């Protein structure tokens, strides 16, 4: 049902191995080595690669007037860059789409921005496996293998969090863009060796009242740094785009 109205799917990654394997499983798909030529035939591009890849890809896509769905939302952390691609999108009629990702409560946050918001706070708890290989932790002398109890490894604003944890905290970028910005959004990251899920607790206070939303996510089997729900949110968004009906927008 999802792909009935889809005419063609183009798949691109750095090496092509994964896309070739996936293309073999999908009747309407083919693996390509460059996106530029295919943009003339695309209505929508879905980025699920990395922040650097997204930064490079977004201007090219919206510059052609093509919609793009971004999973690496941290690509939009730089204000000048974000304003530039937004302006390009307005001029070409393209849309920059950001799914809810691994976080529930974004609908309420979006609604609350119509009025005054006094505080937005995101508390994320992950198992050490989901935070491996981060230079910031090495620089701070934080050794994940030595942590035996829940430990706060970062507390500050979302702008710094997104830059220090580019593969782990895209939800902070989503919340910041939807809410009160990267500098005013508070982020706390906790490492818990006993955690079996990636949990995100979103607290929003404003003239509407107070909202607290907690999501306990099953980590992705292939990438524990992200959550299974993030992939599901992209699929859900794609379904709504294809159907042209948006319930709960």
Predicted regions: what they are:
Residues 1-2:
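Short, small-residue-biased leader/transition segments that mark boundaries at the very start
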Residues 6, 29, 64-67, 91-94:
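A short helix->loop->beta-strand "cap" motif at the edges of active sites that frequently abuts
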Residues 9:
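Short beta-strand element of Class I
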Residues 12-16:
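Residues in the short beta-alpha loop(s) of Rossmann-like NAD(P)-binding domains
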Residues 21-29:
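Short, conserved SAM-binding/catalytic segment
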Residues 30-63, 75-79:
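Beta-loop-alpha module in the N-terminal Rossmann-like domain of NAD(P)-dependent dehydrogenases
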Residues 59, 73-95:
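Rossmann-fold NAD(P)-binding glycine/threonine-rich loop
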Residues 96-97, 102-249:
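Active-site-lining helix/loop region of Rossmann-like oxidoreductase modules
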